[in-house]
Design a protein with these regions (language model features):
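Flexible phosphate-sensing "switch/lid" loops adjacent to ATP/NTP-binding sites
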Residues: 1-315, 320, 337-340, 363-364, ...
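Catalytic nucleophile serine of serine hydrolases
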Residues: 325
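Conserved catalytic-site region of short-chain dehydrogenase/reductase
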Residues: 330
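Conserved P-loop NTPase catalytic core
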Residues: 341-368
Length: 495
């Protein structure tokens, strides 16, 4: 089990690396996180919802994502409450205080999922959440040491040196644990190091002396480009290098599934920016409204900050606008919430009015994987595979964006404004290339200047890069010994 000294210490990516390494070494591996809080989610083949971090880890392990890998998913819908999803199904909205009172009732679900995975796989790589030393939360812990005790898991504790104070992080965390919890920690890991590791060696020796725990490795700041489901992801902060095409994605307050746009970020001609103000928006070559966990609140925010008027003005001038899921709903004429499902109280709002659609929210959530062929003129014929996660039902009076495999029309297009419910639409190389070519033609750029990108190949390369970086800087023999396993001789450890 990998636990961290804080959120953002690198647990998710370290778990992905270990999944990849163990799979490369010939083991059947599965990831597991008992409780995940995230806005980015995924729909499995059987229509169940789980966090994307475990999806990435499953891909690293070479196995299909399975809801057992993340039995509890919390999707924040406000500053004080979340939608609670158990075994892929929505249990309802809960204020944080209520969830904390009731979460121990979910232990049977957690153990059933874990034990079922343990029957099917050789190694389970468990990810903790936040820090195990949050002393105000320890009594009801089901995701850090509380879980480690339930499943009798050895623990690796990782600290983030890039933020500074890593020795205090690790020592303080260990000191705040109970003796039986400290005994579960088999080794310490320093993550995200930049520079000469020799400078750290005196500190490492002192840390080992004070904690009575070995340091298993110092992992460098790896530049592997792996999906990050954290809503505070650096991906939303960094402005891409200047490229011929400028795509502005609105960073909504409750933005979700922004991993949809990772393929665009990798395109050699597309510069992707995440914007929050009219000044940042400027005059891009296209505007994208992403998914959101709270369409109503984010539509009101869009209106209040002036972005609604700015986007509408750009659309009237012919700038392409794309809405995905909640962003698609916002582009329509009206959004009705008769039961208060989305906003907490019955109301009807006007949308941006850029598409001839009306959306009504209902309690039942649609979750499905879909294959489709795009029918919208600029991208007609492009094949894509995606997934839907939404409560709104949208009535369309215009032309569809695409046709699903069963012949059902999906989404809407009017002029240069496009809307679809399909997450993951740009994972299809066909649509990504046609989208870029469309923008190139509008700007007089030769689209042939860019070589096609296979996101599947790119993700594989990045996962291998991540695994290689960890393999070369972690004492894998010690990691295997902590699990009571012998390190496979054929690969060994290159440290």
């Amino acid at each position: 089990m990998v636990q961290g000294t804080m959120s953002g210490a690198g647990k998710s990516l370290l778990c992905a690396a270990l999944c990849r390494i163990f799979a490369q070494d010939g083991w059947r591996v599965a990831p597991f996180k008992s409780q995940n809080m995230a806005l980015n989610s995924f729909v499995t083949r059987d229509g169940l919802e789980m966090g994307r971090a475990q999806v990435v880890q499953a891909q690293a392990a070479g196995v299909e994502p399975d809801v057992r890998m993340n039995p509890i998913l919390l999707k924040p819908s406000s500053d004080i409450g979340s939608q609670v999803i158990v075994n892929g199904e929505v249990r309802g909205q809960m204020p944080a205080a209520e969830y904390f009172r009731r979460k121990k009732q979910l232990i049977p679900d957690i153990l059933a999922a874990y034990n079922s995975l343990a029957d099917d796989f050789d190694i389970i790589v468990i990810e903790g959440a936040g820090s195990p030393a949050e002393i105000n939360l320890k009594a009801d812990d089901i995701v850090n040491m509380g879980l480690a005790k339930l499943v009798d898991a050895p623990v690796l504790l990782v600290g983030d040196i890039d933020r500074g104070g890593v020795f205090a992080q690790l020592f303080g965390t260990v000191e705040l644990l109970e003796p039986d919890e400290r005994a579960r920690i088999k080794g310490l890991i320093i993550n995200k190091f930049r520079g000469d590791v020799g400078i750290l060696r005196p500190g490492l020796a002192m840390l080992e002396e004070k904690t009575h725990l070995p340091v298993f490795g110092v992992v460098p700041y790896l530049k592997a480009d792996i999906e990050d489901e954290d809503s505070l992801s650096d991906r939303l902060q960094v402005k891409n290098a200047v490229k011929p095409l400028d795509a502005a994605i609105v960073r909504l307050p409750h933005i979700s599934n922004f991993t949809d746009f990772m393929p665009l970020e990798q395109h050699p001609l597309l510069g992707v920016r995440y914007v929050q103000t009219t000044r940042e928006l400027g005059a891009p070559d296209c505007v994208i409204l992403p998914g959101t966990k709270n369409t109503v609140d984010d539509l009101l925010w869009l209106r209040q900050c002036g972005l609604e008027a700015a986007i509408s003005k750009l659309a009237r001038r012919g700038t392409p606008v794309l809405g995905v899921c909640g962003g698609y709903q916002m582009l329509g004429q009206t959004l009705a919430d008769p039961e208060g499902t989305e906003s907490g109280r019955p109301q009807t709002l006007r949308g941006l009015g850029l598409l001839p659609t009306q959306t009504t929210f209902a309690a039942e959530k649609r979750r499905t994987q879909s294959q489709a062929t795009v029918t919208a003129a600029p991208f007609a014929g492009a094949h894509l595979t995606g997934y839907e996660i939404h409560t709104g039902r949208t009535t369309v009076q215009g032309a569809p964006f695409c046709t699903l495999a069963d012949g059902t029309p999906e989404g809407c297009v009017q002029g240069q404004v496009f809307g679809t419910y399909l997450h993951g639409l740009f994972d299809s190389g066909e649509l990504t290339e046609q989208f870029a070519a469309y923008l190139c033609r509008r700007k007089g750029i030769d689209p042939a200047a860019a070589a096609p990108i296979s996101m599947q190949e790119y993700r594989t390369q990045q996962l291998d890069l991540l695994a290689d970086g960890v393999r070369h800087n972690l004492d894998l023999a010690a990691v295997y010994a902590a699990m009571g396993l012998a390190q496979p001789a054929e690969r060994g450890n290159d440290q």
